Each structure stands twice: as structure tokens, then as C-alpha cells.
Curated annotation (Swiss-Prot):
It catalyses: a 1-acyl-sn-glycero-3-phosphocholine(out) + H(+)(out) = a 1-acyl-sn-glycero-3-phosphocholine(in) + H(+)(in); a 1-acyl-sn-glycero-3-phosphoethanolamine(out) + H(+)(out) = a 1-acyl-sn-glycero-3-phosphoethanolamine(in) + H(+)(in); a 1-O-(1Z-alkenyl)-sn-glycero-3-phosphocholine(out) + H(+)(out) = a 1-O-(1Z-alkenyl)-sn-glycero-3-phosphocholine(in) + H(+)(in); a 1-O-(1Z-alkenyl)-sn-glycero-3-phosphoethanolamine(out) + H(+)(out) = a 1-O-(1Z-alkenyl)-sn-glycero-3-phosphoethanolamine(in) + H(+)(in). Keywords: Lipid transport, Lysosome, Membrane, Transmembrane, Transmembrane helix, Transport. This is Protein spinster homolog 1. Mediates the rate-limiting, proton-dependent, lysosomal efflux of lysophospholipids. Selective for zwitterionic headgroups such as lysophosphatidylcholine (LPC) and lysophosphatidylethanolamine (LPE). Essential player in lysosomal homeostasis. It is a multi-pass membrane protein. The gene is spns1.
Amino acid sequence: MTSRSSQGDAAPFLTQADNTEEEGAPDPGGHSSDEEEEEGKDHGKEAHLLTGISYRHSVTIVIILFYINLLNYMDRFTVAGVLSDIKEDYHISDSNSGLVQTVFICSYMFLAPVFGYLGDRYNRKLIMCIGISFWSLVTLLSSFVSKQYFWLFLLTRGLVGVGEASYSTIAPTIIADLFLADQRSRMLSFFYFATPVGCGLGYIAGSKVTSTAGDWHWALRVTPGLGLVAVLLLIFVAKEPPRGALERKSDRPLTNTSWFSDVKALLKNPSFILSTFGFTTVAFVTGALALWGPTYLMRSRRVIYKTEPCQGGICNYDDSMIFGGITCVTGVLGVLTGVEISKRYRKTNPRADPLVCAVGMISSAPFLYLSLAFADTSLVATYAFIFIGETLLSLNWALVADILLYVVIPTRRSTAEALQIVVSHLLGDAGSPYLIGVISDQIQKGKAPSFLIQMRSLEYALMICAFVGVIGGGFFLATALFIEKDRKRAELFSQGLLPADETDAERIVVPKRGRSTKVPVSSVLI
């Protein structure tokens, strides 16, 4: 046991928590690309034997989950792409415009723990089918709300959160039960491509459909039909894998503990808590930029070119289109870059994942600030700085998800996903769009209305994002201090070497500083 422990401490942190070691396995740090490919094939065969799902079918399931993720983000940011039209149609202020996104996030946030609890205990495929069907129906209904009933439009947009809560707490755990190690990282990165691509397509589709149909309501009628296709794919193609089958090293089945025990254990997991707060800052920044970015660029264009984007109820969507394109490209580029850098850095540093996240957050802050500072003089420079800043922000999407999956035991992952969603949205993008709108309104109060005042007020409000980004980097740096210990504890549980709850009954007495001391079994095994 001693030799094995020392080897585990010295070995490079190449793979994630569920990459279990075999006796006589070569040092992961010395793997060539051919060896990694062979290892991937072996993992695929092993996964098929343990889950009863072939590698090809597993990839197909991930593609379906990617499609669902894409649709949900596309629907969410279609609203952001036509926000100027919504504001004109309902005659609302900046703060009320921010509420359109905030009510959705609040609904999503409060429903996430419910679906997290259900996802750890019941059929995950059925839960997603029900949630997505409801989301498609409510999204369609929201497109028929007339301009006299803004409160009803807010209500329907809030209910849309059911769909995202039903899949976002569950989909990553299904991927975790289908793949191991680097394969899991790659599949998670592919799944999270849908976040930026869906955001960008939402801006583009919203603006294109609105300009073609001459009515922004039609933009909300695109995704419901596609949601029905997603439900059919889940029913007839997707298959649910057994929970934690790939990670068990004994015949002892994984058993659920009570929800309160799950939450108590998660609150004692510093890597989970700190990475969740780090991701909260990501949600704050991206939520504010996603809703207000196109609107701010439109206002900047008014100041620079002395033009009026919205004339006769029709708005100029060049900025929404460009912002959407940038979001797509930078998201894919950032996720790919983050995963690849972390994979290579992990060979020499086991804390690679949180460190890459920290560098991305801290580095993005000055570029976000510069994008705002140059907006009234050069839109080209603004777009360039937005491109760099959003790329750096996107480094962490797949890495944060991977951190959660390898520091949390399989029977608590949906609950952990739900808690992370609640915290990140409660303190992040649930309030940031509304907060930015309120600050903008307060800055404008008492001043003569002008294009310059409208732009400046939103500019100063959005500068908060740069400071929040630096704070997020600090949380990820703190995560790096605990990541190894929490990862090993989750590994030991998955291998049947550690119970889910470390009470006094699972502690042993060891000599420490000349006296007998009770310590957790995990501290000895590690």
C-alpha cells in the first residue's frame, strides 16, 4: 500500500478522477499518441461491457445531448438578439428589459434542485423528455403574448426554465456514466460547444427571422418544433447508462444517501464549493454581456455614425449578427483551447484544470475593459477586444464541468450539478442583467436624454464585469489548493475503498505527534 500511495502522489495528473489505475500500467506522463489511442479503444471496450452500450451508440447519445443543449441556449439568446424590438414593443425601461432574462434564470435556478434530486434517483431519460416537452410548449405560447401583457410574457419566459433545469442537471452525469478519463473530457468539451454556438445562433436566428418576417414574435417560434425532434430522439435513440458502472471496482452496488446527507457532504467539499463560486463569476459576466452586448454595440453605433438603428419599429441587426458570430467562434475556440492546454499541462501539474480556469478569468478582465473603453471611437477595436476577452472566458466551460464530475461521487452528481446551477445563477446571471439595467437607468436619471448618455450609462454599468472576472480568477486559484485531495477521495469511493459518509465509524486510530488520533480512512489510503 505504501508503494502504491507514493506512486499516486508522484504520478502526473494526466487523467481525471475516473481514470482508474491497473497494476503494471505505464506512467501516464509517458504516453505517446499511439498509446493514448490504444488506451481509448480499451476504455471503449470496457465501457461497452460495463454499460451494455457500444462506443458508437454512446457517441450518438452525446450528439443528442449536444443538440438539446444547443436548442436551449439558442432559445435563451434569441430573446437577447431581439431585445431592442421587445423593448420598443412593450415600452419598457432598461431595468425591465433585464427582467426578461432574470425571470428565466430564477425559474431555472429554483427548479434545478428538484430535477437534481430526481436525476440521482429516477429515470433520467424520462425526466428530460417531460421537461423538454413542457419547455417547447411554453416557448411557443410566449410568442403569442400581445403588447398589453408584458407581465404574462415574463411569466411564460420564466416557465421556459423548466426545460433547461431538466437537462442541465442530468446530461453531464449521463456523459460521465458513458466515458472515462480523457474520453470523458473530450465528450464534455463537445457537449459544451453547444453553449457558445447556441448563444451565437440565437442572436443570428433571432435577428434573421425577425428581419425576414417583420415581427420579432416569429423568432420565438423556431425552437419549439426543433424541441419536439429532440424528444423523439431521446425516446427512440438514446439509452440510459447505469449510474457509476464504469467507476466501480467491486461488486458492491452504489447506494443513495438522503438528500440532506448529499448536500452536507457537498458543502464539505472545498473543490466543489470554490469552483462553483468561480463559475458563478463566469455566469455573472457572460449573462450580462450576452443580454446587453448587442444593445450596447447598437448604442455605440448611434454615437459614432449618428444613426438611428430602430426606425419604424424595425431595428438594425448588424451588431446582433456580428456579436452572435463572435460568440460562436470564440466559444468553440475557447473550449478547445482550454481542454487542450489543460490536457498538456496536467502531465506536469495535477492542478492544471483550476489553474487554466484562473488564468482565463484574470486575463479576460483587461480585454473586456478595453472593449468598453474603445466603443465610442472604434467598433473594429471593440469587436477585436470582445473576441479576445470572450475566448479567454470560454476556456473554463468544459473544465469546470469536469472538475465537478471527478471531485463528486457518482450518486451525488446530479445534486451537485443542481447546487452549482442554483449558486451560479442566484449570484450570477440571474441578477447581473437586471443589475446592469438598474445601474444604467440610475446613471441616466436627471440627465437630458441623448444617444451619448444612453451609451455611457450602459458602458459604466458593464465595467463591473471586468472586476468580477478578477474575483473569479481568485476562486479558481483557491480551488487548486484542494483539487488533488478531493479527487482522490472521490476515486476511493468509486473503487469501493471508502464509504459515502465518513463518520466516526469509518475512522481509524493512528499515532500522530506522540498520541493516538482518529483520522478518516481516506487520509491513510491516500
